[in-house]
């Protein structure tokens, strides 16, 4: 069973699912997690000694090698992928679609909730595909676009029957001076409650949460890259589960251009009130903030203020880093870590490979 301690401040079209002003209203629902079952498999049943037809001494027995199946540190048990595919998508219904960026924000970002009736058994950190209505310039149906899920596994309404997305409307001017609109993002941002939407998935295991409830989880996000981290944090701080209680440290770094693009800010500040010792929150607002040297405050600039502390955390085997958002953020973060690791005589790029191998460095960028 999972109980929701608080609710989002977002508007909600479902009666009883949320309370205006963010006042908490407990709600319960069943959450099933299959038993954790891992096995070891042998590569063979053994080797018999072979005797030569001309010699009486037996050849030495060959060593028996046993292949041990790797046990993941993440919550992979029972994870479902690709239940719905492009040829046979699930048809959900839009329940809510609301803009969550200010009027002066550089672009629009929308939070939307779709019905699933429990038919899309996703986990925090997974994605779904959306197939927009209509046809392309060649007369063929539009291809699906993948979006990180922005809700916990039980959904914004705590009934395990919805899935939420965080989508930025893509509009830009190409080299010819023509205004181009992203097909799927505009389709989604224009959806009205009651409209149908074709959904595929769920997909992905890269961004699944760690099993260890005492882990340190460092989340690095830019823009709509906040989506999977909202799903993590709702599970950690807004819900109660019989089989999961987060007692570790969650540290979120969120990079955005302006204050009006700080997505879900009220939710995150409420989490800090609930668990001030277990949740740290740092914003990097590039067009409004600078560091001591007068440089623009990008996510890597903010991280540099805590570089020694971050490096010490990264030396521990229960620290997990998750990065989601614009691909350009990777280099800036690597630059910081290269210098830090070098002080200890460590090659950062090699060390990062080890972290990836142990599932402690997880990246989803675009």
Swiss-Prot record:
Please list the cofactors this protein needs: FAD
Q: What is its EC number?
A: 1.18.1.2
Name positions with the PTM Phosphoserine: 185
Record key words, sorted: Chloroplast, Disulfide bond, Electron transport, FAD, Flavoprotein, Membrane, NADP, Oxidoreductase, Phosphoprotein, Photosynthesis, Plastid, Thylakoid, Transit peptide, Transport
The cellular location(s) given in this protein's UniProt record come to: Plastid, Chloroplast stroma; Plastid, Chloroplast thylakoid membrane
Residues of the signal peptide: none
Would I find Flavoprotein among this entry's keywords? yes
Q: Provide the protein name.
A: Ferredoxin--NADP reductase, leaf isozyme 2, chloroplastic
Q: Give the organism the record lists.
A: Oryza sativa subsp. indica (Rice)
